[in-house]
Amino acid sequence: MLIKLLTKVFGSRNDRTLRRMRKVVEQINRMEPEMEQLSDELLKAKTVEFRGRLAQGAALDSLLPEAFATVREASKRVFGMRHFDVQLLGGMVLNERCIAEMRTGEGKTLTATLPAYLNALTGKGVHVVTVNDYLAQRDAENNRPLFEFLGLSVGINLPGMAAPAKRAAYAADITYGTNNEYGFDYLRDNMAFSPEERVQRKLHYALVDEVDSILIDEARTPLIISGPAEDSSELYIKVDKLIPHLKRQEKEDSDTFQGDGHYSVDEKTRQVNLTERGLVLIEELLADVGIMDEGESLYSPANIMLMHHVTAALRAHALFTRDVDYIVKEGEVIIVDEHTGRTMQGRRWSDGLHQAVEAKEGVQIQNENQTLASITFQNYFRLYEKLAGMTGTADTEAFEFSSIYKLDTIVVPTNRPMIRKDLPDLVYMTEQDKIAAIIEDIRERTAKGQPVLVGTVSIEKSEMVSHELTKAGIAHSVLNAKFHAKEADIVAQAGQPGAVTIATNMAGRGTDIMLGGSWQAEIALLESPTEAQIEAIKAEWQTCHDAVLAAGGLHIIGTERHESRRIDNQLRGRSGRQGDAGSSRFYLSLEDSLMRIFASDRVANMMRKLGMKPGEAIEHPWVTKAIANAQRKVESRNFDIRKQLLEYDDVASDQRRAIYTQRNELLDGGDVVDTINSIREDVFKVVIDSYIPPQSLEEMWDVAGLEERLRNDFDLELPITEWLDKEPELHEETLRERILTMAVEHYQSKEEVVGGEMMRSFEKGIMLQTLDSLWKEHLAAMDYLRQGIHLRGYAQKDPKQEYKRESFAMFAAMLESLKYEVISVLSKVQVRMPEEVEALERQRREDAERLARQQQLSHLDDQSAAAQEMASQTGDRKIGRNDPCPCGSGKKYKQCHGRLNA
């Protein structure tokens, strides 16, 4: 109550921020007449002037009013578009390390040009981040004329580009690209073997479009660069064939997992667990097909990988549905993004899940991968000196932006008042009733010329609605992951009178739905349109536009509520842009995923009490409140998952930063001879200490063990026993010094052969390779530790603290292993003179030829009988001299059994 009263008197923090910024907007507006008087050359010269002032020590923010006024004037001359005052406000919010919430259709792309220009003046680079390649390319090409007019360069960073092209894109003042590509480039740069291979500059300013999608929806998915691991595709196929024998348990006792079924499914956490009966059955089935010995337990250490395969196969069958979670296209399983409905080409599920789904669908199974490098978006974007973002729906996630990214959310007012009508939800008992009501609503609205956009949560649902519309004889377009290429065209024309468009989730974000259709798209279809043709198209569009407004504007139909209120708001936000008329309504049923998992019992009881009949809908504030509570529950759980992921990844992040810093110092620095000498001392001290403990009696020394260790691991043949026999005065300290001196001399003798320059290059290469190899193994070990760490909770220990403690112990051990491996490899390397190499190569060739002749003669002797038998088998069939020999040796017939028959 008190907070509400104080807000009423002093205004909210949002209001106070906007009040302060409006004063700067007035200042920019006062500069407009002066800017209009400038010639193009003088306006372009402003960029050089601003950079000069920055070089003399001026603060970047002191240039803001003049820089924004310059961009606004340049936009008027290049595009014929003037930034609204609210867009200037949005630009200021983005410059202040904040999230700007700007409604759909308010011109976020044009707003972004203001802070992008201002921050590009520093010369450190600006990264504009979009959700897909199409938007990155579109926005870069659309804004390029404006930035180039002002003397700034623009780059586009797309997947599959060659390193020189990427380097040029990053060297530009402003770079457009996708979040995935920026993240992967960062990881690839930290796997480079020379400074020239790296493409990114220091991360300065990131301007994230659709910031909620990138920093929240995708935050649970880490970016992983992986390499091939061992092949186990056969095992996936064998295990997959056993899963249909298992029966799902409808209700289970969560404590004992007793019941009729063989496995239970928890849809909330997306986990599958075997029951006691299921475990017994799967062990019997595995024994029957010979994968496991009879009487053996699936939980025994030897079968731990088999358990992993069974769990992956169960999850693939019970939790992952075709055309909802993935599609199968040209023999490949492609993941569908649950938030956008787009396919994610090249992305694969980890932990063997993708291979299990491939086995289930009967397509070719790709090898499992091993993690080489990984980072979450949360940690990648926090590497930027300055981060800002914009979206149409951020306010519901303001707390998360603030607590994780330290970004405040500012709601920017609309240019014109919003007049869209958001109608209350209608809830039906069954999905069939709901679909019938949706079809009827579409029929009524299209009859009066109102365009309708139907939002679905999956490809499967979009195709179901499409099928019903086809049956009802209603023409429509479908926009889902299967028709990704036509996305922009379908969305652009979704506002035509009476048009019906079905879209999965937020497919088509970034393209505005113009009421009356897009006249620009129609003009683009003509090769060289005349002025008269353009005017005729515009006049026709104006007629359609007015007709759609008269019919009530664009109507949005949501076929079910999403887990997040924000994504529902994004769907609604497609209507009512720039003060246009519009309406929206959600149709729900008790069979919807969200309702079934989180709210069905409460709402079903409510509907029964109200005496609901099949086909009837309930429309009540209580129901809407129950659904909102269910969504809040899911949002809260997802936030906890993301926060927990971040807390665990922060541990890995500190280690990643240490490794990458060390790696970059290696790449950028000179030789590493001092480092090698230093770690050689450390390594030999540890080795000698383990056989000759400090300040110990000679009787306690294991001299034979030390000699063997030095011989095996460091290629050092040292007669330590002989030294001790011949030199009684040799004590522990002098012995240590002598061993180290001999090791250094042994190494220097190699250096004298190849030369210092080559040895320095070799040292650096070995250090990088060893570091990468051990880091890869460390990441795998961290993954395993992470998977089982929650079990420490049963021992009354905090899993997070245990994870931190153990992971840092593992990290320290890895650094010690790095020192040991590097010195061991460098000590054992065989160095030869060029003439020695040539002589050895000649000897190797002669040995190989002699061995081949012996094998051939042996092969001919052993198989002469087989040749006679084969001749009788082939009968009259003539074998060509150059045909492959029927014995299966792989040689030509004339060089194998043909000789015996000759």
Swiss-Prot record:
GO molecular function: ATP binding; metal ion binding; protein-exporting ATPase activity
Residues engaged in binding ATP: Q87, G105, E106, G107, K108, T109, D512
Cofactor: Zn(2+)
Induction comment: Repressed under conditions of excess protein secretion capacity and derepressed when protein secretion becomes limiting. This is regulated by SecM.
Family as reported in the entry's similarity comment: Belongs to the SecA family.
Disordered: region residues: 847-902
Bound cofactor: record note: May bind 1 zinc ion per subunit.
Basic residues: bias regions: 891-902
EC number: 7.4.2.8
Xref: InterPro entries: Helicase_ATP-bd, Helicase_C-like, P-loop_NTPase, SEC_C_motif, SecA, SecA_CS, SecA_DEAD, SecA_motor_DEAD
Catalytic activity: ATP + H2O + cellular proteinSide 1 = ADP + phosphate + cellular proteinSide 2
Species classification: Bacteria, Pseudomonadati, Pseudomonadota, Gammaproteobacteria, Enterobacterales
One Pfam family this sequence matches: SecA_PP_bind
GO cellular component term of the entry, any: cell envelope Sec protein transport complex
Keyword set, alphabetical order: ATP-binding, Cell inner membrane, Cell membrane, Cytoplasm, Membrane, Metal-binding, Nucleotide-binding, Protein transport, Translocase, Translocation, Transport, Zinc
Entry-linked HAMAP family: SecA
Membrane topology value: Peripheral membrane protein
Compartment list: Cell inner membrane; Cytoplasm
PROSITE patterns, per database record: SECA (PS01312), SECA_MOTOR_DEAD (PS51196)
Main function: Part of the Sec protein translocase complex. Interacts with the SecYEG preprotein conducting channel. Has a central role in coupling the hydrolysis of ATP to the transfer of proteins into and across the cell membrane, serving both as a receptor for the preprotein-SecB complex and as an ATP-driven molecular motor driving the stepwise translocation of polypeptide chains across the membrane.
Name the record gives this protein: Protein translocase subunit SecA
Species this chain originates from: Edwardsiella ictaluri (strain 93-146)
